Regions:
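Extracytoplasmic/periplasmic sensory segments of membrane signal-transduction proteins
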Residues: 25-127
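Hydrophobic helical h-region of N-terminal Sec-dependent signal peptides
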Residues: 8-16
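Glycine- and small hydrophobic-enriched segments that form the cores of compact globular domains
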Residues: 127-129, 142, 156-157, 169-176, ...
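Loop/turn elements at helix/coil->beta-strand transitions in domains of secreted/extracellular proteins
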Residues: 107-109, 146-148, 181
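Bacterial N-terminal signal peptides that target proteins for export
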Residues: 1-8
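Extracytoplasmic/periplasmic sensor domains and loops in membrane signaling proteins
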Residues: 82-98, 126-155
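Sec/Tat signal peptide C-region and signal peptidase I cleavage site
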Residues: 17-22
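Conserved beta-strands of PAS-like sensory domains
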Residues: 162-192
């Protein structure tokens, strides 16, 4: 009986280590993908210009105004008329991001760029909300400073069954080094 208890304790004590190593592998794979495949275009002029233009436009916007825009976005998701959503999806940055997603051959499930307040500047496809400023993807990148990366836990997508994660990266103005926004990339781990 002592042997069984000891064996059970040993087995249970290994579980967190196994999970930790699995998480480390997931994070390491995504970091490699970011460095090799994403960084080369993260400072593309279309991204930097779009973020800076929106930052200037929304500089004096209150959180109340931002929440109103987010609510407007959420309401339009289920509506036939989507003027606000369509305007964002028709932006040159959104088309650029959609092309990057398409070029990834299924590895990238979504891309969206956020401004200095956490609002979407451009996106490859429809997101469930417009304001990310209250979420870790923006808070753990933009607020943390240049080169900040936040890799979320891996989850099974309920609609596709694919194992996915999101990686978010602070975006800096190459001319000044100032953090101006962030990008979130949905990554299909089964394709990585």
């Amino acid at each position: 009986m002592k042997f069984i208890k000891l064996a059970l304790i040993c087995a249970i004590s290994l579980l967190p280590v196994t999970s930790l190593h699995a998480e480390e592998a997931h994070v390491a794979q995504i970091r490699d993908y970011i460095d090799l495949d994403l960084r080369p275009w993260l400072n593309d002029e279309i991204i930097i210009t779009a973020i800076k233009a929106q930052n200037e436009k929304v500089a004096d916007m209150s959180e109340e105004d931002i929440i109103a825009l987010d609510n407007k976005w959420r309401e339009q998701i289920s509506s036939d008329a989507k003027p606000f959503i369509d305007e964002v999806l028709d932006r040159p940055l959104s088309k650029f991001l959609a092309a990057k997603q398409s070029e990834s051959a299924g590895l990238i499930s979504e891309l969206f760029v956020m401004d200095a307040k956490g609002m979407n500047v451009g996106q490859s496809s429809l997101t469930s909300d417009y304001w990310q400023g209250d979420e870790a993807k923006w808070q753990k990148t933009y607020l943390e400073g240049a080169d900040a990366i936040f890799i979320d836990s891996a989850e099974v997508d309920g609609s596709t069954g694919a194992l996915q994660s999101q990686a978010s990266i602070a975006i800096s103005d190459p001319a000044t080094g100032e953090v101006i926004g962030a990008i979130t990339i949905g990554i299909n781990l089964d394709a990585l």
